[in-house]
Amino acid sequence: MHDILHIIKGEVDSTAATLRAYSHDASIFEVTPRAVIYPKTVGDIKKLIHFASKERQAGVDVSLTVRNAGTCMSGGPLSEGYIIDVSRHLNHIGHVDTEDRTLWV
């Protein structure tokens, strides 16, 4: 986990209160994550994916699960690995292209 702190601009939280809060969503399931990561940039997400890939190549089991509001009713955003919460910093609408009907969030 300390390696992650050095490669991203965002925050990493593994306090008991945070892990408890992220151990459930709107479903009946409960799974405690290793830590919660709050990326500040898209670049942070790319670095996290690269980190996980390198760890897996080294034989370390690393799981990244993206979570937003935690309202899923199927347990989808729950994981024993790292939770990537994009709702803290990556929560604004960027470029909107009405002609192509696309937008960047």
Predicted feature residues:
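Short small/polar-residue motifs
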Residues: 7-9, 89-92
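Glycine-rich N-terminal segment of FAD-binding domains in flavoprotein oxidoreductases
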Residues: 20, 24-90
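Conserved oxyanion/phosphate-binding beta-strand-loop segments in alpha/beta enzyme cores
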Residues: 3-23
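Hydrophobic, small-residue-rich alpha-helical packing segments that form membrane-like cores
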Residues: 95-105
